């Protein structure tokens, strides 16, 4: 696959992962694969320890066999995405382009920019960013997927 140049990921509403113009969400291994991919997307600024991924995917009371399930899941993610994009064994890092667009992050940024503009009395400047936040926030987060960290 090589290095990716652009990615657009939609976590609110219908789950979409468009990387370099190709939809890759169907290459992810089932619901659990989508949950893990989404978690890694939102935490891509740093490597994520395997124990943290276990908690994210299965919760505090995860049975011992989930360690093997996590290894299998990560192997399938590497196969679908390309091993060069999912780095590490004890700490896992998803490598996405710096310009990656994630709708949930755009909503948070829009809300922050709107609040800052309002605080400075620039009401008109708040309109666009507030609209982005509103339109993303009206869609459910990770529709149809379940994990301890999804609320």
Regions found by a protein language model. Give the residues of each.
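A short, compositionally biased
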Residues: 9-15, 80-81
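Residue-level signal for inorganic ion chemistry
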Residues: 53, 77, 133
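Short acidic, hydrophobic short linear motifs in intrinsically disordered regions
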Residues: 47-56
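Long, low-complexity, charged/polar intrinsically disordered regions in eukaryotic proteins
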Residues: 2-10
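A structural micro-motif at secondary-structure boundaries
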Residues: 12-34
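C-terminal flanking helix
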Residues: 71-74, 78-82
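Intrinsically disordered, charged and Pro/Gly-enriched terminal/linker segments
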Residues: 1-3, 25-31, 39-45, 58-68, ...
């Amino acid at each position: 696959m090589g290095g990716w140049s652009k990615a657009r990921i939609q976590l609110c509403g219908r789950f979409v992962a468009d990387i370099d113009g190709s939809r890759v969400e169907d290459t992810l291994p089932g619901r659990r694969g989508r949950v893990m991919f989404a978690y890694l997307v939102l935490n891509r600024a740093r490597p994520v320890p395997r124990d943290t991924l276990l908690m994210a995917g299965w919760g505090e009371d995860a049975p011992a066999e989930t360690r093997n399930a996590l290894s299998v899941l990560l192997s399938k993610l590497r196969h679908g995405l390309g091993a060069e994009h999912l780095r590490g064994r004890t700490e896992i890092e998803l490598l996405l382009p710096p310009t990656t667009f994630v709708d949930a992050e755009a909503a948070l940024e829009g809300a922050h920019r709107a609040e800052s503009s309002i605080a400075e009395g620039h009401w008109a400047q708040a309109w666009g960013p507030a609209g982005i936040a509103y339109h993303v926030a009206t869609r459910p987060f990770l529709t149809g997927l379940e994990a301890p960290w999804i609320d």
